[in-house]
Amino acid sequence: MPLRAEITTSLFGAWRLFKFDPGGMKYFNHTADGFWRSFSAALIALPMFLVLSILHTTDAEAGRSTGIGLHLLRYGLGWVVFPIVMVWLVQVLERRGQYASYIIAINWLAIPQWTLVLVVSYLGMALGGIVGDLFVLSLLMLLLYYDYFVTRLVLDLGVGKTILVVVIGLLLAVLLDALILSLG
């Protein structure tokens, strides 16, 4: 399948997953090529990430030339570190056969998730105060639930193991953020 058609089909599958429809999985290319092509989602979501980075950049960060570079480093590491950790984790969980499909789904789902993050972040900033904070907190809970939904669906795990995978992903994100902040 040509890349453009695969992107379109995969985005439709991601939209279905975004609506909590398990049928979205059938729109992904579950081959080795499909696995590697799913990382093109990082390029598609990049403009949204850049807008968010600019929205959340403080005046002090804006004055440093390393600010956007560190944001980009964090973004890139986020797309690489979790799949690498999952290579080990799916072995521990005895789910190696579902690894590629899981990463494919997580990668493509990132596009509607980044879209949601952009919209909710903008609304949260516009509303400000406690209402804005509640928007952001609600967003975080929803994103974690998306991770839970896809993890449980694709890896076919029980509740406890699914939560473990989601928490490991969250801890990796926090660790990467702390690492990047220490470099700035």
PLM regions with names:
Residues 121-184:
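Terminal transmembrane helical module of multi-pass membrane proteins
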Residues 76, 80, 84, 110, ...:
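Residue-level signal for the membrane-embedded core of alpha-helical transmembrane segments
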Residues 85, 98-99, 111, 115, ...:
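Amphipathic alpha-helical interface surfaces
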Residues 81-82, 108-127, 182-184:
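C-terminal halves and exits of single transmembrane alpha-helices
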Residues 98-107, 160-164:
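Cytoplasmic-side transmembrane-helix entry/capping segments in multi-pass membrane proteins
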